[in-house]
């Protein structure tokens, strides 16, 4: 880790504007870090040094004339789910082999418009389906964190594992990510980084490979709360190309950092105390409550009674939407094509060879719950549960609660290739137990590092807010961050 790659976005921005450093110097420092570490961590599936240096030179020219954007010269990594013009975009799937789009996603275009520099594309679970980043066609991402005294390789979480690992290992200043059921917040918790899933509709989904369209939402993973606020402001926009984009301008989220939480009501849902929850997670939760209380917030018990139905309902809805969205990949116009004796055979062979096991599992499950005989019993019922979950949150917020504090993961990072989890996919799905409810309700949620477990691995806490009140999450998370401190992995790579 060099001195330059240790700078937060806020610190680097200051040094770039004051001309203490140049964008080219900063970019070269990150490219050097990637070259040294990516063989061990596997966070990047494509590195774009020529593009990065060209963008950095353009940033230096704008900085010299005083026309700098909000992210001028800041090197970022991009999750492989976001379309990047003429650059590898495969959602880490073999089915999209060789695909290079001729267009740019709205979110990444917003970042480039603000002067950010693209370092490359980041590894992820195939089509964003997974909680460990072991489902990538390009192999698993390795968490930069290790348990004290151990050399065992750990998962970084998923699906945005490459984004979280790259930020934690200082291989980018920040990263784009996406969250369908926890894919920003869970990897952030596993890697000691900050991740926010904004309100559904806050960031455009145009140009992002779809998994479950009514749940997917883009957001940033960053080193601290301030950096996450800076990134989200630039990522968010109103977009006519996305019918789910909300006609609301994003405020200056950074202005919320340092604001008082005095008088705020923080809800503690009793349903999040699940059977078998480790004592360390409960203790961390209690610590978070104490920090907020010390800062002047009021802690109140609340009930979200339909929480226990969220996980099965989520996997029904998400798989159903995935089976529909992924029907378009057939090997005809782009991506992998395996020849067959006729067109139907070609479809079957291309999809069988192109999709990994977890993606196939979810397509099959989604097709099943949408089939004529089971639609009412599963899909329709899951959508009704979704409405009830949303209503639970609405009632709590209507009663005066400003934000909700919960755990974000049931454990710290686990080993790559864990046999118990590999043998039972449902156990892996349980990693999303604390995160899926707010995707079902479309609410904003933020994961902030809050401590280390007995093995020296990071643990996070989750804050859930009212629709389009991300500022509340940023100011509340900053209080936790100030109390807990920041966490950096010891370099072994």
Curated annotation (Swiss-Prot):
<feature type="active site" description="Acyl-ester intermediate">
    <location>
        <position position="183"/>
    </location>
</feature>
<protein>
    <recommendedName>
        <fullName>Glutamyl-tRNA(Gln) amidotransferase subunit A</fullName>
        <ecNumber>6.3.5.7</ecNumber>
    </recommendedName>
</protein>
<feature type="active site" description="Charge relay system">
    <location>
        <position position="159"/>
    </location>
</feature>
<dbReference type="InterPro" id="IPR023631">
    <property type="entry name" value="Amidase_dom"/>
</dbReference>
<comment type="function">
    <text>Allows the formation of correctly charged Gln-tRNA(Gln) through the transamidation of misacylated Glu-tRNA(Gln) in organisms which lack glutaminyl-tRNA synthetase. The reaction takes place in the presence of glutamine and ATP through an activated gamma-phospho-Glu-tRNA(Gln).</text>
</comment>
<dbReference type="GO" id="GO:0030956">
    <property type="term" value="C:glutamyl-tRNA(Gln) amidotransferase complex"/>
</dbReference>
<feature type="active site" description="Charge relay system">
    <location>
        <position position="79"/>
    </location>
</feature>
<keyword id="KW-0067">ATP-binding</keyword>
<keyword id="KW-0436">Ligase</keyword>
<dbReference type="GO" id="GO:0005524">
    <property type="term" value="F:ATP binding"/>
</dbReference>
<keyword id="KW-0547">Nucleotide-binding</keyword>
<dbReference type="GO" id="GO:0050567">
    <property type="term" value="F:glutaminyl-tRNA synthase (glutamine-hydrolyzing) activity"/>
</dbReference>
<dbReference type="GO" id="GO:0006412">
    <property type="term" value="P:translation"/>
</dbReference>
<dbReference type="InterPro" id="IPR036928">
    <property type="entry name" value="AS_sf"/>
</dbReference>
<comment type="similarity">
    <text>Belongs to the amidase family. GatA subfamily.</text>
</comment>
<dbReference type="InterPro" id="IPR004412">
    <property type="entry name" value="GatA"/>
</dbReference>
<dbReference type="InterPro" id="IPR020556">
    <property type="entry name" value="Amidase_CS"/>
</dbReference>
<dbReference type="Pfam" id="PF01425">
    <property type="entry name" value="Amidase"/>
</dbReference>
<keyword id="KW-0648">Protein biosynthesis</keyword>
<comment type="subunit">
    <text>Heterotrimer of A, B and C subunits.</text>
</comment>
<dbReference type="InterPro" id="IPR000120">
    <property type="entry name" value="Amidase"/>
</dbReference>
